């Protein structure tokens, strides 16, 4: 049964059926029992075949539930709302029941109340308003008083848009919570039920950056929110914001005086399609509302928030690769060139130049025909010929080339098995391979973790996509930059793929590329964006997997343990710290002899980084305190 009448200001609805997939990851907690008497939870190895990290926080298992501190979570289910939904032929239980299921699934205690006077304001208290459309004047005053005393609020959808008599009152109530409502979300080519997660915010520590989240069809139209901070953006499938509607959120958070607010722009009836993503977001949101410190291993090294790869599919008009190589070399930007070997053997001079300038040289197949729907034998023959052709130009280069990208992004599971067997270390794939903007490890039978293929999704529109929309160099530059900015905000791996046939002098891409690279360089110099080749991303992703971060909370102090396995040191390890109080900067004390002192960097009011120059294999221990505030 639907809740009915989801447009708070009028009857009816305009919601279509979304396209959605089941995300290709799952959390796997491992419980180790030591001895026959005392079971000890060692720490969580939360790894998916996508290879993205889930934060490890003390004894938190599959959720943040174990990390909840003192304080109470109240679920406000008022008679006023029940009566309002009854009058419009709806059923308020449909919106409340998902919360009860969430608390049961997470093993979290909560108190369901029908009157806000039942709230006992204590430290870390949270009131949840589950699509509470009808809120009376007395209830609004009571809630405002609770906020002044430090109670925080989590609200969903169109709470407070009507009074106790069911009369429309507008968006003023949500605005009083720090949420600006810009209206309803319009249909967007089938993506109106998709939101995109930003990484490394207090509300998304359990999410991969750029994670597409598909919401269930609902009679309640999604709203467009704006707040001080955005944890989930409104985008299309390519993670691009709607033109003319920048910086609009599906999940926002803010803080005003003593109270914090989290707002979800969609109703509870939308959750079912992605409970495995919604629940961790609720976990993190409640932790933030309860002012709990949190930690996580960052995705990228040296404090960078996001990464960017620029690569060329070097095929027809092979020599035009020199134009991109010139631009990259002049700026000191690494790049990857995927060589179509049947074309490469016709232009050995360009191949030698790319190799001599130490660009990442990788394979793009033998001929420009995809590998999909071909027999294993045919694929093997093609891969063998591909390597032989490059070896005819430079045997050492043919052996050292680590990456592969299938022509037309057409490949099959057998293709990747053959790549792994021949020693290829990474595969740059199509954007639909994963819903997240991160590399992942391809699990394969009888393949050791060290030899697993690193799969990297193309996360941005390529030059063919962009040139089909515009031939104007300035418009193209803006589109390329917008895609990069979106990924930079989300914190993922941005992958721009261009083609040699579009890089000749005078072509729009050639004209747009230099200023685009200048923008990339600007962000790298600011410490925000890591510019890396495919090989560098692959090597980092392998090194990062050898690092484990475990935290345990002692009041508002954290005990932090870091372990590095393997035989090689890891440089640039970055640990994210979500501080309990706005503007606090953590102080770090080494508690184990020989531990490396990190550099502490403030990111924003709620986030700091601990950046470790180099960590040798071994174990390290620290104490993290939160007594120092910024001025």
Which residue stretches match the model-derived regions?
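Extracellular ligand-binding/catalytic regions of CAZymes and related secreted enzymes
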Residues: 12-36, 40-72, 240-250, 256-311, ...
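Aromatic-Pro/Gly-enriched surface loop or interdomain linker
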Residues: 23-123, 270, 328, 337
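A glycine-rich, often tryptophan-bearing local segment used as a flexible ligand/cofactor-contacting loop or short
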Residues: 134-204
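Metal-dependent polysaccharide deacetylase catalytic core of the NodB/CE4 family, i.e.
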Residues: 161-163, 167-172, 185, 304-308, ...
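Catalytic beta-strand/loop cores that center a nucleophilic Ser/Cys/Thr
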Residues: 188-257
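Surface-exposed beta-strand/loop patches in extracellular or lumenal glycoproteins
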Residues: 210-220, 563-584
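Catalytic grooves of carbohydrate-active enzymes
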Residues: 307-316, 457-536
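C-terminal beta-strand-rich structural cap/linker in extracellular carbohydrate-active enzymes
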Residues: 603-631
């Amino acid at each position: 049964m639907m809740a009915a009448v989801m447009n708070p200001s009028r009857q009816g609805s305009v919601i279509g059926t979304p396209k959605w997939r089941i995300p290709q990851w799952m959390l796997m907690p491992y419980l180790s029992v030591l001895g026959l008497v005392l079971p000890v939870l060692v720490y969580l190895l939360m790894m998916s075949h996508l290879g993205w990290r889930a934060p490890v926080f003390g004894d938190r298992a599959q959720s943040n539930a174990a990390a909840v501190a003192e304080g109470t979570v109240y679920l406000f289910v008022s008679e006023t709302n029940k009566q309002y939904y009854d009058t419009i032929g709806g059923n308020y239980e449909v919106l409340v029941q998902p919360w009860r299921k969430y608390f049961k699934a997470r093993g979290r205690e909560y108190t369901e109340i029908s009157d806000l006077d039942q709230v006992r304001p204590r430290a870390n208290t949270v009131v949840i308003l589950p699509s509470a459309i009808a809120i009376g004047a007395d209830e609004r005053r009571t809630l405002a008083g609770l906020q002044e005393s430090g109670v925080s609020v989590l609200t969903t959808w169109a709470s407070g848009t009507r009074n106790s008599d069911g009369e429309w009152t507008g968006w003023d109530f949500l605005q009083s919570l720090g949420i600006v409502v810009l209206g309803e979300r319009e249909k967007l080519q089938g993506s109106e039920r998709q939101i995109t997660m930003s990484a490394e915010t207090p509300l998304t520590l359990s999410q991969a950056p750029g994670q597409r989240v598909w919401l269930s069809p609902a009679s309640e139209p999604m709203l467009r929110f704006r707040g001080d901070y955005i944890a989930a953006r409104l985008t299309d499938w390519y993670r691009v914001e709607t033109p003319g509607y920048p910086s609009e959120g599906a999940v926002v958070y803010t803080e005003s005086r003593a109270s914090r607010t989290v707002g979800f722009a969609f109703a509870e009836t939308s959750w079912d399609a992605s409970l495995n993503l919604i629940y961790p977001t609720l976990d993190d949101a409640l932790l933030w509302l309860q002012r709990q410190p949190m930690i996580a291993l960052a995705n990228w090294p040296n404090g960078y928030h996001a990464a960017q790869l620029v690569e060329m599919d070097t095929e027809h008009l092979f020599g035009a690769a020199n134009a991109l190589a010139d631009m990259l070399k002049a700026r000191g930007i690494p790049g990857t060139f995927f060589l179509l070997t049947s074309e490469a053997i016709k232009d050995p001079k360009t191949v030698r130049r790319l190799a001599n300038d130490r660009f990442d040289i990788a394979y793009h197949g033998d001929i420009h025909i995809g590998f999909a729907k071909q027999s294993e034998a045919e694929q093997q023959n093609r891969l063998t010929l591909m390597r032989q052709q490059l070896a005819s130009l430079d045997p050492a280069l043919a052996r050292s080339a680590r990456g592969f990208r299938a022509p037309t992004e057409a490949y099959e599971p057998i293709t990747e098995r053959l790549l792994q067997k021949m020693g290829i270390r990474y595969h740059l794939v199509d954007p639909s391979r994963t819903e997240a903007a991160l590399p992942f490890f391809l699990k394969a039978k009888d393949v050791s973790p060290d030899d697993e293929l690193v799969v990297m999704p193309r996360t941005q529109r390529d030059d063919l996509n962009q040139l089909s929309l515009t031939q104007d160099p300035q418009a193209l530059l803006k589109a390329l930059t917008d895609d990069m900015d979106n990924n930079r905000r989300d914190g993922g791996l941005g992958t721009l793929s261009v083609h040699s046939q579009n890089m000749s002098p005078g072509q729009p891409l050639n004209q747009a590329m230099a200023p685009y690279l200048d923008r990339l360089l600007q962000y790298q110099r600011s410490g925000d964006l890591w510019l890396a080749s495919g090989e560098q991303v692959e090597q980092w992703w392998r090194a990062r997997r050898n690092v484990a971060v475990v935290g345990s909370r002692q009041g508002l102090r954290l005990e932090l343990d870091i372990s590095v396995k393997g035989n090689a040191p890891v440089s640039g390890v970055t640990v994210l710290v979500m501080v309990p109080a706005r503007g606090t900067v953590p102080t770090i004390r080494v508690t184990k002899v020989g531990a490396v002192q990190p550099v502490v960097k403030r990111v924003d009011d709620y986030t700091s980084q601990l950046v470790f120059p180099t960590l040798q294999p071994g174990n390290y221990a620290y104490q993290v305190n939160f007594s120092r505030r910024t001025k």
